[in-house]
């Protein structure tokens, strides 16, 4: 069937892509995207779970908080206690600490109120530091996904 309309998807994508890269560096756009994703997660995942009977019980709520704190403390303690014996691989014990910290942060900070630029900067720095430690066991700015330069660029852009 001839409609007279050409399929020019590649042309449209080529026109949008250069501007999209610049837009994605804007911290306001990043925060808006984070809030959209968190809103979807809250509406489709968190709220249905929160309304279940088991999650509403006080025992379950206390257990989740205690579990997050235990993971955080145990991961940090094992990292420092066993660093001499494990050497470079001691950073693997940070994984439970990071999971516990992320669990506590997401339940207390991000799921109840919208994300602000300050919270987003804090989250990006936490992720950058975590990636830097997990890639080679040292804090040496060797991360590639969550770089501190990208968060510094957005900090200077919002301050000027």
Swiss-Prot record:
It holds the Pfam family CRPA. It is a multi-pass membrane protein. The keyword Transmembrane applies. Coiled coil: none annotated. It is found in: Membrane. Keywords: Membrane, Transmembrane, Transmembrane helix. It comes from the Bacteria. InterPro entries: CRPA. The chain crosses the membrane at residues 62-82, 91-111. Its main location: membrane. GO terms for cellular component: outer membrane. The keyword Metal-binding does not apply. This is Sulfur-rich protein. It comes from Chlamydia caviae (strain ATCC VR-813 / DSM 19441 / 03DC25 / GPIC) (Chlamydophila caviae).
């Amino acid at each position: 069937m001839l409609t007279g309309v050409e399929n020019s998807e590649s042309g449209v994508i080529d026109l949008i892509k250069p501007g999209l890269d610049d837009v994605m560096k804007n911290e306001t756009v990043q925060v808006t995207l984070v809030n959209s994703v968190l809103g979807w997660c809250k509406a489709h995942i968190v709220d249905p779970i929160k309304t279940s009977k088991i999650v509403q019980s006080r025992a379950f709520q206390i257990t989740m908080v205690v579990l997050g704190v235990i993971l955080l403390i145990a991961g940090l303690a094992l990292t420092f206690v066993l660093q001499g014996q494990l050497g470079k691989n001691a950073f693997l014990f940070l994984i439970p600490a990071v999971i516990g910290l992320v669990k506590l942060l997401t339940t207390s900070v991000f799921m109840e109120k919208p994300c602000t630029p300050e919270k987003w900067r804090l989250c990006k720095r936490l992720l950058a530091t975590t990636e830097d430690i997990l890639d080679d066991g040292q804090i040496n700015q060797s991360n590639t996904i969550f770089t501190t330069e990208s968060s510094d660029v957005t900090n200077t852009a919002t301050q000027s």
